[in-house]
Amino acid sequence: MAFTKKTVRDIDVDGKRVLVRVDFNVPIKDGVVGDTTRIKAALPTINYLVEHNARVILMSHLGRPEGTGFQPELSLEPVAKKLAELSGLDVAFVADTYGEKAAEAVAAVEPGKVLVLENVRFDKREKKNDPEIAKKLASYGDVFVLDAFGTAHRAQGSVVGPAAYLPAVAGFLLEKEVDTLTGIFAEPERPFVAIVGGSKVSSKIGVLDHLIDSADTLIIGGGMAYTFFLAQGLSVGQSLKEEDWVERAGEMLKKAEEKGVKILLPIDNRVADHFGEDAVPEVVASDAIPDDREGMDIGPKTEELYAEAVKRAKTVFWNGPMGVFEFDNFAHGTQAIAEAVAEADCTSIIGGGDSVAAVNKFNLADKMSWISTGGGASMELVEGKALPGVEALLDA
């Protein structure tokens, strides 16, 4: 499916001030960037602009500031340094976003140089999409580029605001994300196997519904599986469950059956007597979960069942872990799925969030066809929803 918005290729950026909303929301501990995936993902757009003599002004959020001013642990300064290191470019940083210092730093940017502004969320008006914020940011540029796919589903000041005042186009990452995630559902090579995990049915209901409409096989794991067990009349002990969603889960099972879509649920589970890293796993069948145990991961027989389905696939979409993969004792299921997807002869799309963390944890990122940088944005796109950030851009 062709991208329907203008991109940086479609505009003249030579000598222009190009304001770029990137997604540099990366993990930082003690001033050190832990995962550079999102920084690297922004490089094609940044490099293109530098090569075409643009004056590049980058803005992003980092973490969840209170919006009451500077918080040192959430400053983008370490990210700016990491960007310079990864790109080899001349990157400046200004510890300001909307004030005089920022305006002066923007005015000093020369063609082919890069400036990183401070965290846009240090001001609470950013989240409210305050027009004053939008106007201020727009005053820094001649052109606006949105390349932050991870925040494209949020109608916030730095995401949609400048598009009201400047010619607004997409960066290469945004274009690729939208193309890939919409394309996989428009014309997937079959068999198309979708894998959905995570804790709650309620948070993935739209995604599950959409996948039943497009996939050949839907694999379900993680905490949400126990709500489906309840819909089948099984007992789940102390496992995570959403009583209010049992009926809806049952309706989805019925819908899948009517459409000829195969739904695979765990046939065995790793359970424990408490939730914790020190919990000792026991393997039990799905119809024999003890009342005093809670499910923490899929079991070994389920791993084989799921891996076999993945092996036959030509297209795989995966979002959400199979268990509490942060605990080593309960990471087996997620690792088994990650390895199966990596080994399969298929187009593999990893749909953001915890699945990306899992793929990175098991060092399998380079074996996947596409790893999305968006969590919520990926899911909303998969559900068929319009993303406010994309909607605000100029039509091609």
Tell me the role of every PLM-derived stretch:
Residues 1-396:
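Active-site loop-to-helix "anion-binding N-cap" substructures in soluble metabolic enzymes
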